[in-house]
Amino acid sequence: MKNVFLSVFAMLVAVTSWAQTSVVTFNLNMENETVSEGGVYLGGGVIGGPTEHELTDPDGDGVYSVDVVINNEDSGGNYIFLNGNCPDWSCKENLQGLPCSDPANWNDRILPEINGDMTISTCFGQCSEDGSCQAPPPASAVTFRVDMSEYTGTYGAVNLNGSFNGW
């Protein structure tokens, strides 16, 4: 009888430790961003698709939040924030080269160790751990001059394109 009790107890411990979940509150400061009319989302990696969880800002303070139940075993998995409803991931934050990104996983963020309910506060496109945002660099006026005196083609205009204008 003692062995049966111990076996049942061991199975209960194994099952409950195997299925540990926690509520993780994600707070995302969007003060430096023009928020898309499509919404702000959390997705990627262990979270799911690009529109898996919509964040909301009911008090209008610029901090968008969502509570997500996550398996504790997903610690170290990836996630990302998106400014807009873009199934092709085109509106995800750009963390390339920042210390909070995982270059082996599309430069997504890395979940910290999850041992219980917790809060993650950060800034869109930055590695803040307290929810604060660094001021964006000041805008600069740039003048491009193109010498077209040697051009013999038929186009009548010069266009400049790049990542700065959505190219």
Question: Residue spans of the language-model regions?
Answer:
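Bacterial Sec-dependent N-terminal signal peptides
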Residues: 1-25, 135-139
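Compositionally biased regions
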Residues: 8, 18, 23, 91, ...
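A short, amphipathic beta-strand motif
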Residues: 22-30, 142-147
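Aromatic-rich carbohydrate-binding modules that target alpha-glucans
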Residues: 32-74, 84-112, 148-167
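Exposed beta-strand face motif in extracellular beta-rich ectodomains
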Residues: 75-79
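Compositionally biased low-complexity segments at domain edges in trafficked proteins
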Residues: 112-143
